[in-house]
Amino acid sequence: HIAAYAELNVLSNFSFLEGGSHPEELIERAAFLGYRAIALTDRNTLAGVVRFHTAAKAKGIQAIIGARIDIEDGASFICLPKDRSAYSRLSKLLTLGKRRAQKSMCKLWRSDIVEYLQGQILIILPPLSFSASKLYIDQKRIDSEFADELSKWVEQLSGSVYLSASLCYREDDDSRLAALQKLAEQSGAPMVATNDILYHHPRRRPLQDLLTCIRKQCTITQAGFELELNAERYLKSPLEIKNGYEKYPDAITKTIEIADRCEFSMTDIRYKYPSVLTRSGNSAEDELRVRTWEGAKKRYSIDKYPLGVPESVKKQINYELDIIEKLKYAPYFLTVYDMVKFARERNILCQGRGSAANSAVCYCLGITAVDPNQSAVLFERFISEARGEPPDIDVDFEHERREEVIQHIYETYGRERAGLAATVVTFRSRSAIRAVSYTHLTLPTSFLV
């Protein structure tokens, strides 16, 4: 049975040293609990969304893509793009914040957000201090400032701003939910239930405490209120969440409303290849054919091959070109050809490798060095209509002169259309053991793997 609830506030371990579960674990648990939709909203990053999407697709669950945005002059909020254009704007916003800050940090102000609001759904996160009269002396000021901030968001993005309500499992939960509901009615931002997830299962709590100690650079005995007060920030069943909001059923139904509005999927993202590499009047397909046959004549020159290009190679080239044209990959091959041509003209060592070595076209373009006339090539390992995956040509450039190639790419296609692959920082056994030892915390070795 699938209950009518979608979890919209979830951190994974891509919120480094904060989230205690892998995206795949969250999806696995969500499928077990009967979720039809769940969001991934890591803090100031979209780094985990591909793994999240892949796992969700395998389980038949809607993966809602988003991020938790922290700003310097206001409350944090969940940002959920409704379509591909909104996802692009969210990516640009996070890039802006990352460029301003030190490594792994993000620095944004409210004024930055306005330019990127179109197509977004915002779920504003009230501070834990909201309506907590027994804990804070200046409670009225805290509540008033947050109410004013929420009203401003509603004015700027009417119809797409919601107010998050999470059970803190404190004695003042009832009064806090009542205060949030009242504020929602006053501001016009509907209240929506979230559970502020940090890990997929209750037994992951000790690991999350450990991560907190490492992040705060303290021992477990020093951590105190830095640790979560309880083990409730795990992925609960939709029915359990629903029971916690019996007085506020609309807060549950709003989660499905938001899920339905978030139509963006990672499958919406497609390669858009450059179109500036063709001669006047030529299509990309015609240009690729010309370049390939020019290269074939050089590879199979008369002095080595008196009869010209071998018939078997001609047949293979035509076969590959037909598939490339059918799948509209010609601009991609021309792009790689341009980079390799640039490098070779400047005597920069380069070599294509991997599955591209199974392509006669790549050989004729000078990208790879495997002669299809001397070895059996299996083009389907490189490009397959059945797989429906775009080709992947790996080219190595000599380290000392790689920057020249990068600058050529920037100048030819524009810096805004080029990207460098990033690596994800992870713990390995030795570094994990060292970090744990600093916290003076003993854990089973299974937590360190």
Predicted regions and their residues:
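Phosphodiester-processing cores and adjacent nucleic acid-binding clamps
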Residues: 1-441
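Single conserved hydrophobic/aromatic residue that forms the stacking wall/gate
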Residues: 440-449
